[in-house]
Amino acid sequence: MWSVMGLVRRTAMSSTVNKASPVRSLLGGFRCLNVESKEEDEKKDMTVLEAKKLMRLVNVEDMKKKLIGMGDKEMVTYTTLIEASQGLGIARSLDEAHAFARVLDDAGVILIFRDKVYLHPHKVVDLIRKAVPLGLNPDDELIREEFDKMRSMKEEIDVLAHQQVRKILWGGLGYSVVQIGIFVRLTFWEFSWDVMEPITFFTTATGIIVGYAYFLMTSRDPTYQDFMKRLFLSRQRKLLKSHKFDAERFKELENKWKITSCSSSSCHANASIRNRVGVDLDLEDSLQSHHRD
């Protein structure tokens, strides 16, 4: 940093001397020299300020990376931030540490309030937004109406997809019960265990092979939860296509609405179906499935 400052000063001083010489020789007085030197000093000061600003911006970016280590904390004390900036070598003195803290606060990287430093300012803004409702402009009102309409339509599609998935799962349970009943009947009434043992063995081995094939195709563990999620997304994709639902437009409206007035999890479009199905679903899964069609 000091090498850059010294280079700027030397450049400005050399330009001052070079430009002051012809003024002295032509006018033969010191008044013009003083005026010229003043202008050059102002230019030099502006250049130094610009260099300081540039170096501060570089330190802000460096401090952003260093603060990732504190990312698991919501808030630290101001003293902790000052000690961290000095310990990381970003600030050489206490005054520089205070200056860097002000720069971080001005840049919106952190929020300094009294003796507390909030490392996630956007969360503080969300809390204030929920506590103090903001008025909507006409454009936001149109966005809200369109978003509510599409969200209601998507909730109906999700409920219908969930009902179809439940029917399929209950059908699978019925198939398993009937299969076991048939094996019991054949083992103890029609045939004997010597005859049914190979049949049950190969049936179980077939189930294991199917689970392994599922893992190879999906790169996921063959769990009932994952199978239910994929089955739900498959039914949801078909219903979205049949109802001509624009998932990309809905995602855009959801992002705008979350930014303008809604930040809680209950405002997300997948909150109701997540509570009903018990599976963590994301609209991006629906978009990716929709693009594969």
UniProtKB/Swiss-Prot annotation:
Instruction: Supply the Pfam families for this chain.
Output: MCU (PF04678)
Q: Which InterPro entries match?
A: MCU_C, MCU_fam
Which superkingdom?
Eukaryota
Q: Its membrane topology, per UniProt?
A: Multi-pass membrane protein
Enumerate the subcellular locations listed in this protein's record, separating them with semicolons. Answer: Mitochondrion inner membrane
The annotated transit peptide is positioned at 1-33
Provide the alphabetized UniProt keywords: Calcium, Calcium channel, Calcium transport, Ion channel, Ion transport, Membrane, Metal-binding, Mitochondrion, Mitochondrion inner membrane, Transit peptide, Transmembrane, Transmembrane helix, Transport
Which GO terms of type biological process are on file?
Answer: calcium import into the mitochondrion; mitochondrial calcium ion homeostasis
Please give the GO cellular component terms listed in this UniProt entry: mitochondrial inner membrane
- What's the catalysed reaction? Ca(2+)(in) = Ca(2+)(out)
Where is the motif Selectivity filter annotated in this sequence? Answer: 193-201
Residue sites binding Ca(2+) per the record: 197
Predominant localisation class:
mitochondrion
Under Gene Ontology molecular function, one entry of this record is: metal ion binding
Q: Which residues cross the membrane?
A: 168-188, 198-218
General function of this protein = Mitochondrial inner membrane calcium uniporter that mediates calcium uptake into mitochondria. Constitutes a pore-forming and calcium-conducting subunit. Mitochondrial calcium homeostasis plays key roles in cellular physiology and regulates cell bioenergetics, cytoplasmic calcium signals and activation of cell death pathways.
Give the record's family classification: Belongs to the MCU (TC 1.A.77) family.
**Protein name per the record:** Calcium uniporter protein 2, mitochondrial
Organism, as annotated: Arabidopsis thaliana (Mouse-ear cress)
Gene expressing this chain: MCU2
